[in-house]
């Protein structure tokens, strides 16, 4: 599938983003809810309209369960994606391909990290 085919089959209907910075008061789940509900509002949909989701997060040994719990997305497939610095892009790409293939109409691609809470400041170079 070339990029022009993808452009004709997939549309971004909403987006949400949390404030970047030190968010000591918010958990990763809080950030997921904040971004997702902003995206739902922007798209004019509700969480129940989402048919599948992709969660991008690095270093978490859990599956898509945190996203399902935080957003009450019961009984839909949620795939956790991890691809180092390209994790969010990979989650987005997989969600786009699922829509382009005609498997789903409305999907959610979401990525979250809370590096400061884990006391990890990055890799030394």
What kind of feature is each model-predicted range?
Residues 4-79, 97-101, 112-125:
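Conserved "HGTGT" condensation-loop signature of ketosynthase/thiolase-family condensing enzymes
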Residues 83-113:
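Active-site-proximal alpha-helical scaffold in enzymes
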